Protein backbone atom coordinates (compact mmCIF):
# COMPACT_ATOMS: atom_id res chain seq x y z
CA UNK A 1 0.00 0.00 0.00
CA UNK A 2 1.38 3.40 -1.00
CA UNK A 3 2.38 5.85 1.70
CA UNK A 4 0.11 8.91 2.09
CA UNK A 5 3.02 11.20 1.29
CA UNK A 6 3.72 9.42 -1.98
CA UNK A 7 0.02 9.43 -2.88
CA UNK A 8 -0.25 13.17 -2.24
CA UNK A 9 2.92 13.87 -4.21
CA UNK A 10 1.55 11.83 -7.11
CA UNK A 11 -1.68 13.83 -7.14
CA UNK A 12 0.21 17.13 -7.02
CA UNK A 13 2.45 15.91 -9.83
CA UNK A 14 -0.59 14.92 -11.90
CA UNK A 15 -2.20 18.30 -11.26
CA UNK A 16 0.95 20.15 -12.36
CA UNK A 17 1.36 17.90 -15.41
CA UNK A 18 -2.23 18.58 -16.42
CA UNK A 19 -1.83 22.32 -15.84
CA UNK A 20 1.29 22.56 -18.02
CA UNK A 21 -0.38 20.60 -20.82
CA UNK A 22 -3.62 22.55 -20.54
CA UNK A 23 -1.85 25.90 -20.56
CA UNK A 24 -0.58 25.49 -24.13
CA UNK A 25 -2.41 28.35 -25.96
CA UNK A 26 -3.17 26.60 -29.23
CA UNK A 27 -5.51 29.34 -30.45
CA UNK A 28 -2.75 31.94 -30.11
CA UNK A 29 -0.07 29.66 -31.57
CA UNK A 30 -2.13 28.61 -34.60
CA UNK A 31 -3.28 32.12 -35.52
CA UNK A 32 0.27 33.42 -35.33
CA UNK A 33 1.61 30.54 -37.43
CA UNK A 34 -1.10 31.25 -39.99
CA UNK A 35 -0.01 34.88 -40.18
CA UNK A 36 -3.25 36.17 -38.67
CA UNK A 37 -1.58 38.04 -35.83
CA UNK A 38 -2.55 37.95 -32.17
CA UNK A 39 -6.04 36.50 -31.67
CA UNK A 40 -6.22 38.39 -28.37
CA UNK A 41 -6.41 41.64 -30.34
CA UNK A 42 -9.71 40.76 -32.04
CA UNK A 43 -13.27 40.02 -30.96
CA UNK A 44 -13.55 39.07 -27.31
CA UNK A 45 -9.77 38.82 -26.90
CA UNK A 46 -10.23 35.17 -25.97
CA UNK A 47 -7.80 32.47 -27.17
CA UNK A 48 -10.49 29.83 -27.68
CA UNK A 49 -11.99 28.42 -30.87
CA UNK A 50 -14.97 30.79 -30.93
CA UNK A 51 -12.73 33.84 -31.09
CA UNK A 52 -10.37 32.17 -33.56
CA UNK A 53 -13.43 31.73 -35.78
CA UNK A 54 -13.73 35.52 -35.84
CA UNK A 55 -10.56 35.61 -37.95
CA UNK A 56 -12.67 34.06 -40.71
CA UNK A 57 -10.61 30.87 -40.81
CA UNK A 58 -12.98 28.00 -40.04
CA UNK A 59 -10.31 25.31 -40.38
CA UNK A 60 -8.10 27.08 -37.88
CA UNK A 61 -11.02 27.43 -35.47
CA UNK A 62 -11.79 23.71 -35.82
CA UNK A 63 -8.14 22.84 -35.21
CA UNK A 64 -8.13 25.03 -32.10
CA UNK A 65 -11.28 23.34 -30.81
CA UNK A 66 -9.84 19.86 -31.34
CA UNK A 67 -6.44 20.65 -29.83
CA UNK A 68 -7.96 22.42 -26.82
CA UNK A 69 -10.12 19.36 -26.21
CA UNK A 70 -7.20 16.97 -26.69
CA UNK A 71 -5.26 18.75 -23.95
CA UNK A 72 -7.85 17.58 -21.46
CA UNK A 73 -8.20 14.10 -22.94
CA UNK A 74 -4.45 13.48 -23.08
CA UNK A 75 -3.87 14.71 -19.53
CA UNK A 76 -6.58 12.45 -18.13
CA UNK A 77 -5.62 9.35 -20.14
CA UNK A 78 -1.90 9.61 -19.43
CA UNK A 79 -2.42 10.17 -15.70
CA UNK A 80 -4.97 7.32 -15.60
CA UNK A 81 -2.02 4.90 -15.63
CA UNK A 82 -1.51 5.97 -12.01
CA UNK A 83 -5.16 5.55 -11.03
CA UNK A 84 -8.46 7.41 -11.26
CA UNK A 85 -7.51 10.01 -8.65
CA UNK A 86 -4.43 10.95 -10.67
CA UNK A 87 -6.55 11.14 -13.83
CA UNK A 88 -9.05 13.42 -12.09
CA UNK A 89 -6.24 15.66 -10.80
CA UNK A 90 -4.58 15.87 -14.22
CA UNK A 91 -7.88 16.54 -15.97
CA UNK A 92 -8.73 19.33 -13.58
CA UNK A 93 -5.21 20.70 -13.95
CA UNK A 94 -5.59 20.80 -17.74
CA UNK A 95 -8.90 22.63 -17.41
CA UNK A 96 -7.39 25.23 -15.06
CA UNK A 97 -4.32 25.51 -17.28
CA UNK A 98 -6.47 26.38 -20.26
CA UNK A 99 -8.35 29.03 -18.29
CA UNK A 100 -5.28 30.55 -16.65
CA UNK A 101 -2.15 29.82 -18.75
CA UNK A 102 1.00 31.04 -17.06
CA UNK A 103 2.68 31.77 -20.41
CA UNK A 104 0.27 34.57 -21.39
CA UNK A 105 -0.49 36.31 -18.13
CA UNK A 106 -3.09 33.80 -16.88
CA UNK A 107 -5.64 35.02 -19.46
CA UNK A 108 -6.93 31.98 -21.32
CA UNK A 109 -10.11 30.58 -22.80
CA UNK A 110 -13.51 29.87 -21.31
CA UNK A 111 -12.86 26.17 -20.90
CA UNK A 112 -15.67 24.47 -22.81
CA UNK A 113 -13.49 22.54 -25.27
CA UNK A 114 -11.09 21.42 -22.55
CA UNK A 115 -14.04 20.54 -20.29
CA UNK A 116 -15.29 18.25 -23.05
CA UNK A 117 -11.82 16.83 -23.57
CA UNK A 118 -11.45 15.95 -19.90
CA UNK A 119 -14.90 14.38 -20.01
CA UNK A 120 -13.89 12.22 -22.98
CA UNK A 121 -10.81 11.05 -21.09
CA UNK A 122 -12.59 10.28 -17.81
CA UNK A 123 -16.11 9.25 -18.85
CA UNK A 124 -16.66 9.07 -22.60
CA UNK A 125 -20.36 8.25 -22.17
CA UNK A 126 -20.72 11.58 -20.39
CA UNK A 127 -19.27 13.25 -23.47
CA UNK A 128 -22.17 11.83 -25.48
CA UNK A 129 -24.58 13.40 -22.98
CA UNK A 130 -22.75 16.72 -23.34
CA UNK A 131 -22.89 16.53 -27.14
CA UNK A 132 -26.59 15.65 -27.16
CA UNK A 133 -27.47 18.49 -24.78
CA UNK A 134 -25.39 20.96 -26.79
CA UNK A 135 -26.93 19.96 -30.12
CA UNK A 136 -30.52 20.02 -28.85
CA UNK A 137 -30.07 23.42 -27.20
CA UNK A 138 -28.31 24.83 -30.26
CA UNK A 139 -31.07 23.63 -32.58
CA UNK A 140 -33.75 25.13 -30.34
CA UNK A 141 -32.08 28.45 -29.53
CA UNK A 142 -29.13 28.94 -31.91
CA UNK A 143 -27.07 30.26 -29.00
CA UNK A 144 -23.63 28.62 -28.78
CA UNK A 145 -22.95 29.98 -25.30
CA UNK A 146 -26.30 28.81 -23.91
CA UNK A 147 -25.76 25.40 -25.48
CA UNK A 148 -22.40 25.08 -23.72
CA UNK A 149 -23.88 26.18 -20.40
CA UNK A 150 -26.80 23.76 -20.61
CA UNK A 151 -24.53 20.89 -21.67
CA UNK A 152 -22.08 21.52 -18.83
CA UNK A 153 -24.96 21.71 -16.36
CA UNK A 154 -26.40 18.37 -17.47
CA UNK A 155 -23.10 16.45 -17.23
CA UNK A 156 -22.60 16.34 -13.42
CA UNK A 157 -26.27 15.43 -12.97
CA UNK A 158 -25.89 12.56 -15.45
CA UNK A 159 -22.69 11.35 -13.78
CA UNK A 160 -24.26 11.48 -10.33
CA UNK A 161 -27.32 9.58 -11.53
CA UNK A 162 -25.00 6.78 -12.69
CA UNK A 163 -23.43 6.56 -9.25
CA UNK A 164 -20.09 8.20 -10.02
CA UNK A 165 -19.94 10.72 -7.20
CA UNK A 166 -16.24 11.54 -7.61
CA UNK A 167 -16.58 12.52 -11.26
CA UNK A 168 -19.90 14.25 -10.61
CA UNK A 169 -18.20 16.41 -7.97
CA UNK A 170 -15.31 17.22 -10.31
CA UNK A 171 -17.56 18.28 -13.16
CA UNK A 172 -19.89 20.18 -10.84
CA UNK A 173 -16.91 22.31 -9.81
CA UNK A 174 -15.83 22.70 -13.44
CA UNK A 175 -19.37 23.66 -14.43
CA UNK A 176 -19.45 26.43 -11.83
CA UNK A 177 -16.17 27.76 -13.24
CA UNK A 178 -17.53 27.57 -16.81
CA UNK A 179 -20.55 29.63 -15.71
CA UNK A 180 -18.27 32.20 -14.07
CA UNK A 181 -16.15 32.47 -17.23
CA UNK A 182 -19.35 32.96 -19.25
CA UNK A 183 -20.82 35.67 -17.03
CA UNK A 184 -20.62 38.26 -19.84
CA UNK A 185 -22.43 35.84 -22.16
CA UNK A 186 -25.07 35.20 -19.51
CA UNK A 187 -25.62 38.94 -19.15
CA UNK A 188 -26.06 39.29 -22.92
CA UNK A 189 -28.43 36.31 -22.99
CA UNK A 190 -30.58 37.95 -20.33
CA UNK A 191 -30.50 41.25 -22.23
CA UNK A 192 -31.26 39.60 -25.57
CA UNK A 193 -28.03 40.86 -27.14
CA UNK A 194 -26.06 37.60 -27.37
CA UNK A 195 -25.02 36.66 -30.91
CA UNK A 196 -26.65 33.59 -32.41
CA UNK A 197 -24.95 30.82 -34.36
CA UNK A 198 -24.49 31.94 -37.95
CA UNK A 199 -25.24 35.58 -37.19
CA UNK A 200 -23.22 38.16 -39.11
CA UNK A 201 -21.07 40.69 -37.27
Swiss-Prot record:
<comment type="pathway">
    <text>Lipid metabolism; phospholipid metabolism.</text>
</comment>
<keyword id="KW-0472">Membrane</keyword>
<keyword id="KW-0443">Lipid metabolism</keyword>
<feature type="transmembrane region" description="Helical">
    <location>
        <begin position="116"/>
        <end position="136"/>
    </location>
</feature>
<dbReference type="GO" id="GO:0008654">
    <property type="term" value="P:phospholipid biosynthetic process"/>
</dbReference>
<feature type="transmembrane region" description="Helical">
    <location>
        <begin position="10"/>
        <end position="30"/>
    </location>
</feature>
<keyword id="KW-0812">Transmembrane</keyword>
<keyword id="KW-0997">Cell inner membrane</keyword>
<comment type="similarity">
    <text>Belongs to the PlsY family.</text>
</comment>
<keyword id="KW-0808">Transferase</keyword>
<keyword id="KW-0444">Lipid biosynthesis</keyword>
<dbReference type="GO" id="GO:0043772">
    <property type="term" value="F:acyl-phosphate glycerol-3-phosphate acyltransferase activity"/>
</dbReference>
<feature type="transmembrane region" description="Helical">
    <location>
        <begin position="86"/>
        <end position="106"/>
    </location>
</feature>
<protein>
    <recommendedName>
        <fullName>Glycerol-3-phosphate acyltransferase</fullName>
        <ecNumber>2.3.1.275</ecNumber>
    </recommendedName>
</protein>
<keyword id="KW-0594">Phospholipid biosynthesis</keyword>
<dbReference type="InterPro" id="IPR003811">
    <property type="entry name" value="G3P_acylTferase_PlsY"/>
</dbReference>
<dbReference type="Pfam" id="PF02660">
    <property type="entry name" value="G3P_acyltransf"/>
</dbReference>
<comment type="function">
    <text>Catalyzes the transfer of an acyl group from acyl-phosphate (acyl-PO(4)) to glycerol-3-phosphate (G3P) to form lysophosphatidic acid (LPA). This enzyme utilizes acyl-phosphate as fatty acyl donor, but not acyl-CoA or acyl-ACP.</text>
</comment>
<keyword id="KW-1003">Cell membrane</keyword>
<feature type="transmembrane region" description="Helical">
    <location>
        <begin position="60"/>
        <end position="80"/>
    </location>
</feature>
<keyword id="KW-1133">Transmembrane helix</keyword>
<dbReference type="GO" id="GO:0005886">
    <property type="term" value="C:plasma membrane"/>
</dbReference>
<comment type="subunit">
    <text>Probably interacts with PlsX.</text>
</comment>
<feature type="transmembrane region" description="Helical">
    <location>
        <begin position="166"/>
        <end position="186"/>
    </location>
</feature>
<keyword id="KW-1208">Phospholipid metabolism</keyword>
<feature type="transmembrane region" description="Helical">
    <location>
        <begin position="139"/>
        <end position="159"/>
    </location>
</feature>
